[in-house]
Amino acid sequence: MGYPKKGEIYLVNFDPTIGHEVKKKIPAVIISNNIHNQFSPLVTVAPLSSNINKIYPFEVYVLKESAGLNENSKIMIIQLRSIDKKRLINKIGNIEDKEIINKINKMISEHFGLSS
């Protein structure tokens, strides 16, 4: 059996949660690198939301066609989480567009103050 790869989108069970954390079963993109994903029981994900009325500077807009999704969505970088792979329900899409991957990487760097 394979392992989740960076850029793949899974339906993820985020419950139980506390406070403002993302709740329910929603899509999330795998953010952690493939070496980590292959050997660790955890993966790092960024949840997606189809509520795109407002896109904040720390979110990445994704067209449904570019990721195999049912709706246009935004990736919520501020909600990054490392989760057990048991929370992954099933693969529902994939982000292959290098421009989107680069935007995600840039947002993560900015979020953690790693950009120069």
Where are these regions (language model features)?
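Feature marks short, surface-exposed loop/turn motifs that line or immediately flank catalytic pockets
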Residues: I18, I52, D84
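C-terminal terminal-subdomain/extension
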Residues: G2, A67-S116
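Short, Lys/Arg- and Gly-enriched loop/turn segments at beta-strand edges
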Residues: T17-K25
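Short, surface-exposed secondary-structure edge patches
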Residues: M1-Y3, G19
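Compact nucleic-acid interaction/catalytic patches
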Residues: K23-K24, I30-E65
